[in-house]
Amino acid sequence: MKIKQILYCMLLACFILPASAQNSWGIVGGGLFSKSLSRDARFSLGGYAGGMYDVHVKNSWYVQPQLLFTYEEFRSKTRLGTDSFFSKFNLELPILASYNVALNNKWNLRINAGPYLSYAMFGRDKSIDYAYGNGMHSSLGWWHQDFPDHFTYGGRAGVSLESEHFIYTIDGKCSLRKRPFGQSGSLSAGVGYKF
């Protein structure tokens, strides 16, 4: 319950911040490689899309809350002959502190870091056991309300290049909460546009 209250407060802060000439809205999207940090896990493709609000704080400092819809996959293949697949569709709320470095009149480099909170809405799980008797055993299912706990939190850091209204980002994130498939990490690259 406490995590839901924190999430509501962070969302409310995104909408009631005062508008100024230095603040701007934007959209972002891109692809990502995600991986569970557990043994025998492999990288898998995913993606994200969403919105952001860039708040100028002081001099070169900014705060950048984002609201993203993400898709992540986690795969593993054990030496005992079991393939596992787990996917999730999330609503993610990163709150990034950002430092702006002007490279020239056209380009700026932004260094971003901060926490994120993620809510897993639904997904799929699949396992194939090749050591099941003389053949294989496969199971495939959807999960949503029966998933034990939907919230995950962690840290996110990266850099972005900005030119006028366009944004090009490279980010990495790592969950601090251990899930049934272990802690997770991802690397992402994306583009965005500020209005």
Tell me what each language-model feature is.
Residues 36-40, 74-78, 120-126, 179-182:
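Outer-membrane beta-barrel proteins
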Residues 29-33, 69-71, 171-174:
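Generic short beta-strand segments
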Residues 70, 74-88:
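Alpha-helical transmembrane segments and their immediate interhelical/interface regions
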Residues 7-10, 24, 55, 66-68, ...:
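Compositionally biased, intrinsically disordered low-complexity segments enriched
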